[in-house]
């Protein structure tokens, strides 16, 4: 049953036909390509990242079960492009896995958002940081009071906006996600801690990176140097059987993202191109938690210290008189 008004659509019921296992389905393998997702081009021109069925399934199942924790009684608000990882994997695919309903809108509107939440009783939200910032900057409305929204999953939520969604909008569970379309690791704030991308089961490491010279630092033996403190480091993910790096359609572009002989001869790691640091979030089942710092290239040196443009921006955005800042 679909309700369609202009560019809005609410999918309420699942297909309950008897043909659940069509003859053609046995021709589709887990390793087959489900789709190509183009990267945002932060380190060059956009590239087509390969997304096989197994990655699409695994990510959406984990996000549905451990992230949203939704079921058939829930409805998700999704106004993100379905050709991007967030709108597709974190949004639509997670809904399908849960058997839940979803409200899909072609274009996000901050002024009508809470009216839509109330009208369609949306209990879950898939977000990106800018979407949340728009909502935080709106004047209080009657529709936002006693709203049914209880959980939100996405990426890029600013620390100051995080507080707004907890305190003003009353969202109990915020699951910040970190991962790349082409990457082989997923970080998730499973324990609902504040202002963190959470934890991961992947074999990851933070290595020393010289932001001034834009290069990885190595020891006398030619191997990378691990960071053992809470200082920011370049995040890398070991490539292996349980952490496959599918890469891009361009083989040369794929090879450029792989670091070899990192800690020992023959090992291979995916270079995320992001600076990450560990954070203390209190009791967390002994699991290390992380926080996004900045993209490589968006950091500068000041008085012999590495300074993240993103962190400077977060401090400026914490002032009530600042609507938005961009530091570069």
Where are these regions (language model features)?
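Gly/Ser/Thr-rich phosphate-binding loop
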Residues: 97, 119-128, 136-211, 224, ...
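Conserved AMP-binding/adenylation subdomain of ANL enzymes
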Residues: 57-75, 83-123
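Adenylate-forming
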Residues: 13-17, 39, 56-57, 254, ...
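Conserved beta-loop-beta connector loops within the AMP-binding
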Residues: 206-236, 244-247, 280-287
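Conserved S/T- and glycine-rich ATP-binding loop of Class I adenylate-forming
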Residues: 33, 39-42, 76, 82, ...
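Single conserved hydrophobic/aromatic residue that forms the stacking wall/gate
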Residues: 1-11
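Conserved pre-ATP/AMP-binding loop-to-beta segment of ANL
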Residues: 18-38, 45, 69-75
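AMP-binding/adenylate-forming catalytic core of the ANL superfamily
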Residues: 179, 239, 243-251, 255-328
């Amino acid at each position: 049953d679909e309700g369609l008004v202009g560019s809005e659509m609410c999918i309420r019921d699942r297909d309950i036909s008897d043909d659940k296992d069509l003859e053609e389905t046995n021709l589709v393998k887990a390793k087959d390509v489900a789709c190509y997702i183009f990267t945002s081009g932060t380190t060059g021109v956009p590239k087509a990242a390969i997304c096989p069925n197994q990655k699409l399934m695994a990510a959406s199942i984990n996000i549905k079960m451990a992230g949203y924790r939704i079921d058939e009684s829930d409805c998700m608000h999704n106004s993100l492009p379905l050709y991007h990882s967030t709108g597709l994997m974190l949004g639509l695919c997670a809904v399908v896995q849960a058997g839940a309903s979803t409200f899909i809108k072609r274009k996000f509107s901050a002024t009508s958002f809470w009216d839509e939440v109330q009208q369609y009783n949306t209990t879950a939200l898939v977000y990106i940081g800018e979407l949340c910032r728009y909502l935080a900057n709106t004047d209080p409305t009657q529709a936002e009071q006693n709203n049914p929204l209880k959980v939100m999953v996405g990426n890029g939520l600013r620390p100051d906006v995080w507080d707004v969604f907890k305190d003003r909008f009353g969202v109990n569970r915020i699951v910040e996600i970190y991962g790349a379309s082409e990457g082989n690791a997923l970080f998730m704030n499973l324990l609902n801690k504040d202002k963190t991308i959470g934890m991961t089961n992947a074999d990851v490491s933070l290595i020393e990176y010289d932001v001034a010279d834009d290069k990885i630092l190595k020891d006398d033996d030619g191997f990378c140097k691990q960071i053992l403190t809470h200082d920011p480091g370049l995040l890398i993910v070991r490539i292996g059987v349980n952490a496959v790096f599918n890469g891009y359609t361009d083989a040369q572009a794929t090879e450029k993202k792989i670091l070899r002989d990192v800690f020992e001869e023959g090992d291979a790691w995916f270079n995320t191109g992001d600076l990450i640091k560990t954070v203390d979030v209190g009791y967390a089942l002994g699991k290390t938690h992380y926080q996004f710092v900045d993209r490589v290239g968006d950091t500068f040196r000041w008085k012999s210290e590495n300074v993240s443009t993103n962190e400077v921006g977060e401090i400026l955005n914490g002032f009530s008189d600042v609507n938005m800042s961009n530091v570069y």
